[in-house]
């Protein structure tokens, strides 16, 4: 069956990531009846070419829609509109011959590493939020607040970063954002001029690339090895490409491979950035979740004075993706430029939420939650590692990560894309290496984000994974 031609109605300047705008446009076409159940969609390469976007962006949109149940993939055939669409879909106005309702398969997903929202300290958060809503500061406030965020949270974060990560953060140098994604966009707007480039890890984080492109920068991939970003390759890229004005790294638990950059390479990276006069954007991804040994200090904790370093973090990974709270620390004039860009797109943050989270930090509730979550996620990591070894030991290999909420699974003589397609048909959503590739050949690997699955769900997911292994 030929694929349906798609002329998607996508906003010219979407407020969020481009892949979500593409996913929303496809969803609208399904709900309007333009895309019928069972219709075949164009391949990711063809649709990317038609839309003028990177193939990874379309792949991310398809993966999102498969996770939500709008699409499904069939090995060697393609991607199709689901026959059993999500219950939220409105019934079409004109109905053809009635069919028997399709059986809805239980759906599981190895996410990209999202936390489990079931673990949110909801009672403590609700109490703190209620106090914030009833406080004189909120009820008596008749004007907008500071675009950099509420002073109470900036002071609380300053203490938290100093005690938990060894980062000396003056509250005046902190900017509160709606998640780390906004912080990355603002960092690029402040550090890079249109036409300049940001060096990024490859394989790496596609949503960061989207944020940088939206800010007017191009991205250039730098290979990642067992020690993280290759500083030698970065040096060569800077010397050959004068457009590179910044480098983006996730040194603590590299996304997606989970490797940790060692101390010697960190020092070499800081030296390279300083010598070439570029900006370092450090995304301290999953710092909270270190299971063996002490967490490695961030680059921001040992950077020489005056280095243009933008440090990005998030409280969303400690709580839930739906609680949008990120932050950035930067020197002047970078911070002023970031705050001005933030004010232009989002006048200020959520003052009651910021006050509530400041309460959780000061009262110790956030620290207690982090310790509890680490114990639970460590147990889930161990269950996943044991199940993978028992079911797939001869066909795959992996290093048990010392931290983070995902596992990087290397495939032995197996197509990761084909495996992901087969698993999707069986009811398990996977993220293959193509999702994280920029310019180079995609790694034959799968990123298994396990944190949002309990131990029973992990066992069922690994069973589907093993049964879906291509011959």
Where are these regions (language model features)?
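N-terminal basic, amphipathic alpha-helical segments
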Residues: 1-133, 137, 142, 146, ...
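Conserved core of the PLP fold type I
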Residues: 139-277, 288-306, 310, 377
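A generic "structured core" feature
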Residues: 207-210, 276, 280, 290, ...
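Active-site PLP attachment segment
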Residues: 76, 302-337
């Amino acid at each position: 069956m030929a694929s349906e031609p798609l002329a998607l109605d996508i906003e010219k300047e979407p407020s969020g990531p481009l892949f979500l705008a593409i996913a929303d446009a496809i969803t609208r076409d399904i709900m309007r009846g333009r895309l019928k159940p069972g219709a075949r969609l164009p391949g990711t390469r063809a649709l990317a070419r038609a839309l003028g976007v990177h193939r990874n962006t379309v792949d991310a949109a398809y993966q999102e829609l498969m996770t939500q149940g709008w699409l499904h993939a069939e090995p060697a055939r393609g991607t199709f509109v689901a026959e059993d669409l999500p219950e939220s879909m409105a019934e079409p106005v004109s109905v053809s011959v009635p069919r028997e309702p399709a059986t809805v398969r239980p759906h599981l997903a190895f996410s990209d590493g999202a936390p489990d929202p079931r673990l949110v300290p909801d009672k403590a958060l609700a109490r703190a939020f209620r106090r914030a809503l009833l406080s004189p500061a909120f009820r008596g406030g008749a004007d907008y607040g500071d675009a950099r965020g509420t002073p109470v949270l900036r002071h609380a974060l300053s203490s938290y970063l100093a005690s938990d990560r060894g980062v000396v953060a003056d509250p005046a140098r902190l900017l509160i954002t709606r998640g780390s994604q906004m912080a990355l966009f603002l960092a690029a707007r402040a550090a890079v001029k249109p036409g300049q480039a940001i060096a990024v890890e490859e394989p790496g984080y596609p949503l960061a690339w989207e944020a940088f492109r939206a800010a007017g920068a191009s991205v250039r991939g730098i290979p990642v090895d067992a020690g993280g970003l290759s500083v030698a390759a970065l040096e060569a890229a800077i010397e050959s490409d004068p457009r590179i004005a910044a480098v983006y790294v996730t040194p603590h638990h590299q996304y997606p491979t989970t490797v940790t950059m060692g101390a010697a390479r960190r020092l070499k990276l800081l030296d390279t950035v300083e010598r070439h006069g570029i900006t370092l954007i450090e995304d301290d991804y999953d710092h909270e979740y270190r299971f063996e040994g002490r967490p490695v200090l961030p680059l921001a904790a040992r950077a020489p004075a005056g280095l243009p370093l933008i440090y990005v973090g998030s409280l969303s990974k400690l709580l839930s993706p739906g609680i949008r709270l990120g932050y950035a620390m930067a020197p002047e004039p970078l911070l002023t430029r970031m705050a001005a860009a933030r004010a232009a797109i989002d006048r200020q943050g959520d003052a009651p939420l910021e006050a509530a989270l400041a309460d959780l930090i000061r009262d110790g509730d956030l620290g207690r939650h982090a310790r509890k979550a680490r114990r639970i996620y460590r147990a889930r990591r161990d269950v996943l590692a044991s199940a993978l070894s028992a079911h797939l030991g001869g066909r795959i290999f992996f290093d048990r990560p010392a931290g983070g909420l995902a596992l990087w699974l290397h495939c032995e003589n197996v197509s990761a894309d084909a495996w992901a397609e087969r698993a999707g048909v069986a009811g398990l959503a996977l993220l293959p290496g193509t999702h994280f590739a920029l310019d180079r050949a995609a790694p034959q690997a799968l990123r298994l984000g396990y944190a949002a699955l309990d131990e029973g769900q992990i066992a069922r997911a690994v069973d589907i994974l093993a049964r879906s292994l291509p011959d």
